[in-house]
Amino acid sequence: FPPWE
């Protein structure tokens, strides 16, 4: 759930 995924 990272901002880039």
Curated annotation (Swiss-Prot):
GO cellular component: a single term: extracellular region
Highest taxon, organism lineage: Eukaryota
Keyword Secreted in annotation: yes
Keywords: Amidation, Amphibian defense peptide, Secreted
Residues found modified as Glutamic acid 1-amide: 5
Predominant localisation class: secreted
Tissue/organ expression: Expressed by the skin glands.
Cellular localization per UniProt: Secreted
One GO biological process term: defense response
Record family assignment: Belongs to the frog skin active peptide (FSAP) family. Tryptophillin subfamily.
Protein name as catalogued: Tryptophyllin-T2-2
Highest classification ranks of the organism: Eukaryota, Metazoa, Chordata, Craniata, Vertebrata
